[in-house]
Amino acid sequence: MFRLGFVASPETGHEIYQGKLAIPYLTPSGVIDIRFRSLNNDNGPKYLSRPGATTHIYNISALTQDSSMLVVCEGEIDTIIATQVGFTAVGLPGANNWKPYYSRVLDGWEKIMLFCDGDNAGREMAKTISRELDNVFPVFMPDNQDVNDVFLTEGADGLRRRVGA
């Protein structure tokens, strides 16, 4: 479904991506972008994008699902977890990557639940998106935790309880 990969032996000039999780941004017509996530606690950045890449909504195909509620997550991994739990979910590639035109893409959903990390960036993301869309309901994860942390400690039911499901 998400077609994740691992960069074992990168092409010359792309060594920076070695050992990273490859996260493709898929559309019905194919891959439109790819981001890379560090799998260890090295000193480098947690996420890398290709030079010159623009931001996109992750898991855009979820927008075609028949559902009254959409979950918007902060990050690709959180989006994958939310989807596996059973939510119709899309993600932003980080809390600070909201683009004003995303409101047109997300308009029309009966209810949009924002799964926000329990930090300042998550709170700012909630404020920004809530100013642009009327049907937004922020769901904050505990302090310094994200969807993945809650899933690992409380399981799928812990996430479902947060939205009353």
Residue locations for each model-derived region?
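Phosphate-handling DNA/RNA-contact segment within nucleic-acid enzymes
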Residues: 2-110, 125-126
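Glycine-centered helix-coil hinge/cap
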Residues: 59, 75, 134, 155-156, ...
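Acidic beta-strand-to-loop metal/phosphate-binding motif
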Residues: 72, 109-121, 140
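Hydrophobic anchor at the start of a short beta-strand
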Residues: 89-90, 112, 135-138
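Short, acidic/turn-prone active-site loops that include or flank metal/cofactor-
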Residues: 93-98, 117-119, 141-144
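Short, surface-exposed amphipathic charged segments that create phosphate/polyanion-binding patches used
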Residues: 104-108, 148-161
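A polyampholytic, Gly/Pro-enriched intrinsically disordered region
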Residues: 112-118, 154-165
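Short, aromatic/basic amphipathic alpha-helical patches
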Residues: 124-134
